[in-house]
């Protein structure tokens, strides 16, 4: 039986469903992952090195896997990605040494390399094939809101699981990992059912020759980024943001654990905190169309990045858990608004669908590279000085990228001024 034809609205709905299912398992992990690793005996510096294992894998694989998605299809690559995440989650349940935890994060690095880009690229290309004027910024704004809700639900559920400890004999911090494992399996089923894509592998060439195209696709994408001031500015901004993000994702939970002097209690607090943060992030994403109607996307992106850096400095200066929690929620709300702006500028700057996933991967690569560098350097700085000094340093690095959005926004506006 031939399935009914897709419309722009149905593609958007599928995109949003798949986006929510992609991030729901992550919501279960965010409140516990740092605390679980620290509970198993690692120092902040060792935590940074374990995170760096993920960054190293991304550094090696991000561009080739983006090219792979452009060559063999986005759906295939997403399914392979989910397999690596399932393996990582399974190992995380029992991993209790730095080498095993490094393997866990390396597997997640493979997952993130494969996963970054294909879904967005599938949506943009499918929607534009149906309607060249499809409003992709509105879809990315809605995607940010859905992501916030999914992460919020996952964080609340993880907090409840840790607080109630329903499985006797299993560490309370491990139970959300089990839930994430089940939900990732649901995500796989949804990708199979909802992501309709024409095969990019021609019958007369086959998979081997399709894969052989990957190096040429990667080289072409890199040339495109180098030749475009918009794309170059955006990927550099992403690198600086990735370094600064370490202060939010890795160092803020560690600071909260120190202030509360109890990792389990910190995990219980982080659950509802993350829930609120991700809901606020979703709200931030939802107001992006209003912001960009009043000011240029480049200007909005610059101011949001500066505001986010300011809130991270506030986290460093905060002395109590309530202030840390409030500023963390505000930081995530600003991030929820800034990401759709960045993604909209990025996709508008990509002219060829043939290299879209690869260029999106290049952007993701710089962010992951930044996070890897931040994990090592800021982790070492925290061990050598203090958590607060490391958090402030991350915020300052994040702020340096703000003017680059003005470059991206200005160059985007120039062609229309001459029409």
Spell out what each predicted region is:
Residues 58-97:
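Conserved MFS/SLC helix-loop-helix module at the cytosolic interface between two early adjacent transmembrane helices
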Residues 1-12, 194-234:
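Juxtamembrane intracellular "pre-TM" segments in multi-pass secondary transporters
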Residues 171-193, 391-407:
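Symmetry-related core transmembrane helices of the 12-TM Major Facilitator Superfamily/SLC fold
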Residues 3, 50, 54, 59-67, ...:
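C-terminal transmembrane bundle of multi-pass solute transporters/carriers
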Residues 2-60, 93, 229-278:
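Helix-loop boundary and gating motifs at the non-cytosolic
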Residues 180-209, 407-417:
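Helix-loop junctions on the cytosolic side of multi-pass membrane transporters
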Residues 35, 39, 92, 151-177, ...:
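Transmembrane alpha-helix termini and helix-breaking/packing motifs in multi-pass membrane transporters
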């Amino acid at each position: 039986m031939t399935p009914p034809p897709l419309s722009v609205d149905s593609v958007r709905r599928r995109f949003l469903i798949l986006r929510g299912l992609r991030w729901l398992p992550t919501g279960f992990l965010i409140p516990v992952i740092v605390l679980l690793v620290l509970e198993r005996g690692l120092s902040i510096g060792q935590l940074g090195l374990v995170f760096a294992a993920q960054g190293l894998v991304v550094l090696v694989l991000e561009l080739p896997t983006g090219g792979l998605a452009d060559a063999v299809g986005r759906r295939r690559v997403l399914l392979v990605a989910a397999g690596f995440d399932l393996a990582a989650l399974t190992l995380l349940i029992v991993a209790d040494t730095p080498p095993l935890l490094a393997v866990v994060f390396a597997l997640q690095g493979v997952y993130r390399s494969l996963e970054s880009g294909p879904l967005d690229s599938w949506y943009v290309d499918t929607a534009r094939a149906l309607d060249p004027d499809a409003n992709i910024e509105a879809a990315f704004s809605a995607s940010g809101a859905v992501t916030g809700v999914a992460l919020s639900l996952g964080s609340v559920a993880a907090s409840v699981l840790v607080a109630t400890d329903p499985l006797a004999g299993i560490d309370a911090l491990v139970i959300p990992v089990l839930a994430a494992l089940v939900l990732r399996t649901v995500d796989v089923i949804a990708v199979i059912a909802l992501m309709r894509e024409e095969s990019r592998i021609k019958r007369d060439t086959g998979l081997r020759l399709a894969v052989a195209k990957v190096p040429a696709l990667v080289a072409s994408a890199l040339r495109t980024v180098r030749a475009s001031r918009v794309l170059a500015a955006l990927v550099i901004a992403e690198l600086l943001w990735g370094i600064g993000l370490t202060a939010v994702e890795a160092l803020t939970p560690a600071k909260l654990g120190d202030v509360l002097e109890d990792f389990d209690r910190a995990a219980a607090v982080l659950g509802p905190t993350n829930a609120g943060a991700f809901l606020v992030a979703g709200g931030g994403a939802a107001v992006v169309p209003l912001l960009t109607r009043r000011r240029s996307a480049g200007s909005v992106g610059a101011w949001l990045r500066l505001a986010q850096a300011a809130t991270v400095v506030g986290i460093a200066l905060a002395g109590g858990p309530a202030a840390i929690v409030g500023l963390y929620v505000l930081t995530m709300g600003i991030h929820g608004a800034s990401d759709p702006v960045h993604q909209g500028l990025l996709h508008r700057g990509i002219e060829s669908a043939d290299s879209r996933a690869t260029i999106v991967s290049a952007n993701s690569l710089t962010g992951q590279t930044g996070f890897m560098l931040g994990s090592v350097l800021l982790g070492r700085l925290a061990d050598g000085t203090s958590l607060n000094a490391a958090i402030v340093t991350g915020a300052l690095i994040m702020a340096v990228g703000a003017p680059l959005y003005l470059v991206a926004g200005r160059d985007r506006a120039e062609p229309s001024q001459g029409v």
